[in-house]
UniProtKB/Swiss-Prot annotation:
Designated name of the protein: UPF0415 protein C7orf25 homolog
InterPro entries: DUF1308, DUF5614
Similarity-based family: Belongs to the UPF0415 family.
Organism this protein belongs to: Rattus norvegicus (Rat)
């Protein structure tokens, strides 16, 4: 293929990838974190290729074999093939084995955060050679990168379990490397190809003692990837087993939302309080109760004593008869436990968003290793800003409204029917 036809092909590929990346970003309500960054990187690649096309930059084969574009294509393809993608090109901070602060870029975070994917576009030969010490100085082997991923994932638990790591190879991977990754607990996606021993090996394939590690020595130093001999074609795991957390800690905001008259059809009013009218409008558009029930299904429910006590106090003051009745039924389903905030929760500095009550509730959930259900997103963000990330399920709030209905204006029948649940 001539350089110019290769250039045209690359430009077409970049344009197509931009469309696919933009489509990916739109596929999730609220967008995918990092989607704009991915599109921006692709547009930069396209701009550079167009400069070559216009003659502003001299044409070189190395430019056309851009590893950036290959890598970005691998990211797009990975994201398209995974469920519940939450972010792309996500940067995580972690501490390495020497105690140094490091950062790691995860190409695709999927499965609601439970799966980390590294998308690899480089050819199997290059990856295999780097592993065996035949790469350029400073090249980090895939196995070394896998160790970084494992180290970082242990420090970024999602709902109290470490993310599962998948290395997705789009230009094959050698069988020994795939085996090593699997031994490390990493899933492999892509074509797994054989390697052949070189019986009449030239001198340059031999590794000096200083260049190789024990692992490399052990593993046939003189091997060559055989791309024609595909041993296995491995697709993305369709169902990655995730240790689903079965414990749920209920915040006061969730207890109130769960029993609110508004959650049971009482949303067809214009209330005197603007905030209640806004909540009613939100409820007509999107019901909250089915979301809460779906998340709570088959899980053990907990609430700390402070949460239940304050909930009862609010209920006694503002609750209507139906809301109190539903609350009595709900409390019977809950394991009420003593307040026991975790150490890391107690280290939080008080602020307008972080008060002792929230700290106790979320901290108790942390001690229980439970996911805290809450409408208090302000606390979650404030804690996150202080470096404490709680496992949470965030939903929209609903206030106790049964006693307010008498003074509210019912919506006209037509509007009620249009937005009926």
């Amino acid at each position: 293929m001539s350089a110019y036809s290769m250039l045209s092909e690359r430009i077409a590929m970049a344009k197509e990838l931009i469309k696919r990346a933009e489509s990916l970003s739109r596929s999730k309500k609220g967008g995918i974190e990092g989607g704009a960054k991915l599109c921006s990187k692709l547009k930069s690649e396209l701009k550079f290729l167009q400069k070559i096309e216009s003659g502003k930059v001299a044409i070189k084969e190395s430019h056309l074999q851009s590893t950036n574009l290959t890598h970005l294509k691998a990211i797009v393809e990975s994201a398209e093939n995974l469920e519940e993608v939450v972010s792309v090109l996500r940067v995580f901070g972690y501490t390495d084995s020497l105690g140094e602060k490091q950062t790691l870029v995860v190409d695709v975070v999927a499965n609601g955060g439970h799966t980390w994917v590294k998308a690899i576009g480089r050819k199997a030969e290059a990856l295999h050679n780097i592993w065996l010490g035949r790469g350029q100085y400073g090249d980090k082997s895939i196995i070394e990168q896998a160790e970084d991923f494992l180290q970082a994932s242990r420090q970024q638990p999602v709902q109290y379990s470490n993310p599962h790591i998948v290395f997705a190879f789009y230009n094959s991977v050698s069988s020994p490397m795939a085996d090593k990754l699997k031994d490390m607990g990493i899933s492999v996606r892509g074509d797994i190809v054989a390697v052949n021993s070189l019986l009449n090996h030239p001198e340059e394939y031999l590794l000096s003692e200083s260049e190789s590690d024990d692992e490399g020595q052990e593993l046939l130093q003189v091997t060559r990837v055989d791309l024609d001999n595909v041993l296995a074609r491995v697709a993305f795991p369709t169902e990655i087993k995730v240790d689903v957390c079965r414990r749920v800690n209920l915040d006061i905001t969730t207890l109130i939302t769960y029993v609110s008259a508004m959650s049971y059809g009482g949303c067809h009013f214009i209330f005197k309080e603007k905030v209640l009218t806004e909540q009613a409008e939100q409820e007509r558009k999107e019901r909250v109760l089915p979301q809460l029930e779906a998340f709570m299904k088959d899980k053990e429910l907990f609430a700390c004593e402070s949460a239940v006590k304050d909930f009862q106090s609010i209920l006694d003051t503002l609750g209507g008869p139906g809301e109190r009745e539903r609350a009595a039924v709900l409390i019977k389903r809950i394991n009420v436990v003593p307040d026991q905030p975790s150490e890391r929760a107690l280290k939080l500095v008080a602020s307008s968003k972080i008060n002792s009550r929230s700290l106790t509730i979320f901290g108790t959930g942390d001690t229980l290793k439970a996911i805290t259900m809450t409408a208090n997103s302000g606390f979650v963000r404030a804690a996150n800003n202080q470096g404490v990330k709680f496992s949470v399920f965030i939903h929209q709030p609903r206030a106790l409204t049964e006693s307010k209905e008498a003074l509210a204006v019912p919506l006209p029948k037509a509007r009620t029917n249009d937005s009926a649940h």
